[in-house]
């Protein structure tokens, strides 16, 4: 398998759950739990990229490498671009972006996302899973993605895509039957050199409208390969309820 590293963007500020990166999960801060899960993958190296010295301190106390970055980044991807430059990562090295609020992420998904990038010889790869719930289709917090025949992303949206026009006209709460509906999973793989290119790209109006950083890549004409996971991954932590759920999982381990 191609060598890759995991970079974990972790900022202290969070609008819905302040300080969540340091939230305790069964005796360890969440960012440490995420890094420990990532270390179970085949990654050659796991590094946390943070904007706060408290996060760097707790990571280092648990033997986890951490690098300081600016607190002015508006996306995790630009934060990782700064981290990759600071770490002097070779341009062709594969980097997997694991979100800092995913303490239950499957190591196998990390490995597979890196593999998809290499197999498809693209600049960026991500993942998705099939969605079967109508309420989730309509939920703007559930990001959907539609693919072309080559399994590359056509578009990501918070809106219901593909839109079941006939069913909606008839007032029916039905999922599209002609194709699978896919929910995006927030994990990315890219070459370290492409991270720098991303940071230099102009901001896409689409990414601003949808608040989805991956749309910058599509808008600038780069394909994004998408792996369809066999099952939905464990949800990340955005709210206190999510945190309570994850804590309960770790209490049973």
Curated annotation (Swiss-Prot):
Keywords tagged on the record: Cytoplasm, Lipopolysaccharide biosynthesis, Nucleotidyltransferase, Transferase
Primary location class: cytoplasm
Gene3D superfamilies linked: Spore Coat Polysaccharide Biosynthesis Protein SpsA, Chain A (3.90.550.10)
Gene Ontology biological process terms from the UniProt entry: CMP-keto-3-deoxy-D-manno-octulosonic acid biosynthetic process; lipopolysaccharide biosynthetic process
Gene Ontology molecular function, alphabetical: 3-deoxy-manno-octulosonate cytidylyltransferase activity
Catalytic activity: 3-deoxy-alpha-D-manno-oct-2-ulosonate + CTP = CMP-3-deoxy-beta-D-manno-octulosonate + diphosphate
SUPFAM superfamilies in the record: Nucleotide-diphospho-sugar transferases (SSF53448)
Localization in the cell: Cytoplasm
Pfam families: CTP_transf_3 (PF02348)
Record-listed E.C. numbers: 2.7.7.38
Superkingdom of this protein's organism: Bacteria
Gene Ontology CC: one annotated term: cytosol
Pathway: Nucleotide-sugar biosynthesis; CMP-3-deoxy-D-manno-octulosonate biosynthesis; CMP-3-deoxy-D-manno-octulosonate from 3-deoxy-D-manno-octulosonate and CTP: step 1/1; Bacterial outer membrane biogenesis; lipopolysaccharide biosynthesis
Uppermost EC category: transferase
Family: Belongs to the KdsB family.
Known function: Activates KDO (a required 8-carbon sugar) for incorporation into bacterial lipopolysaccharide in Gram-negative bacteria.
Protein name: 3-deoxy-manno-octulosonate cytidylyltransferase
Gene that this sequence comes from: kdsB
